[in-house]
Amino acid sequence: MPIENALASVAVKDVNAAIEWYAKLFGKQPDSRPMPEVAEWKFERGGWLQVYQLPERAGSGSFTLAVSDIDEHVAQLTELGVDTSHRSSGSKVKTLMIADPDGNHIAFAEAIDTSMAR
């Protein structure tokens, strides 16, 4: 069963507040608003992130963003006032963990080992 792509989704308390925060994080407004309580961002090399308003589940999600230069992202996130102190590095990958305003966990991952998938 071939998989063409993937869509990550996270619940938020207020979709409009989440749109404001994620638009700053991604440097662009959502690519799609399929419903009033849903916003979606498409990534250049594939994949989507969907945020949807469901207050009772907000803050319980997590997803990973694959990046080519984690230090560049740390600098940009620091400028936005995001806590970038949760970093780690191994022989295969560097990671940074942050949280959105609702407490959803976001991992940034940079492959060091070229055999790792991007």
Which positions does each model-derived feature cover?
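Vicinal oxygen chelate
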Residues: 5-13, 54-118
